[in-house]
Amino acid sequence: MTQESEGTTPTERSGTEKIVLAAILIVLAVVAGYYLAKNLIPTPKIGVIYLDTQVTDLLDDTMTREINYAKNADDIKGVVMVINSPGGGAAAGHDIYFQVRKLRETKPVIASMDTLAASAAYQIGVGANEIYAKPASIIGNIGVIMGQPSPETLSERTITTGPFKATGGTATSWLQMLDLLHADFRDSVVAERSKAPNPLKLSPEEVATGEIWVGVEAKEYGLIDQLGSRLDAIQRAAELANLKNYQVVDVRDEYLASLTGDQLSSTLKLYEKVDNQPELNLTSEETKWPTFYQLYLPLE
């Protein structure tokens, strides 16, 4: 008759082995789950949109595509708009401004002003949740310019209905329209900046003189929220989106990567046109009708 050796019995050893095996399987499952989740769940992104040329209808087209892509991309949790522009066409600027406001309703948007963010470019920036700028960034120039076509005499064979069919109105009426657009620009800046984290300190009249300010002054007057780098703006967007781990991406690159075939080809051609567009000329002989601009245009 044999006796069990001192220590654990076979039954006890079997139970211990099962526990160890179960623990190993649990650890392996956790590790596998981690790597699986890492591969299947996309890393949250902060998307960067660059506005680095004059504001035109062509730019409006590309900005519309990028803003819509950023708005609809589930993995893009926040957006930084890097702005370096003297402004441009009033209508194109208004369109981009309204789109930025819509974007901020779905995810945080931070404007990062580079060397120059003037006129329409500044208005686009005030559509963001917050504005960052460098101490030497040029900010402001809130006003409107009207570009007139070269005067031409109507042919005697040209017949029009009504006294203003050819001209659109009197010189006085055009000036009144200019004043209306100026007031609208001023009011949009005052409304947006009055509720900003660093609220506006200037009166509506002081805002709308067309003056420019450097970033240090703009911070003091409440035209921007913080002095800081592009990286600071990105970190702020991530903070507002409650992100600690994230990837920074160029929205243009992400958008183009989503296209194929003819759609990609036509879009690349559009971007090429934007990158090579000539500077706006308010007195061009090719201008067919008066046009309103929100453009920083230093007089020579």
Where do the model's predicted regions map?
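Small-residue-centered hinge/linker elements
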Residues: 2-107, 122-123, 127-197, 250-300
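Conserved short-loop catalytic and cofactor-binding motifs
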Residues: 84, 113, 173, 205-206, ...
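Generic non-transmembrane alpha-helix signal with a bias for helix starts/N-cap capping motifs
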Residues: 93-96, 118, 211-212
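Short, well-ordered beta-strand core segments
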Residues: 109, 131-132, 224-227
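Glycine-rich beta-to-alpha transition loops that act as phosphate-gripper elements at the mouths
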Residues: 110-118, 206-210
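Short, well-ordered alpha-helical microsegments
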Residues: 119-122, 234
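Flexible, glycine-rich surface segments
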Residues: 184-238
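Extended, charged amphipathic interaction segments
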Residues: 213-215, 230, 234-264
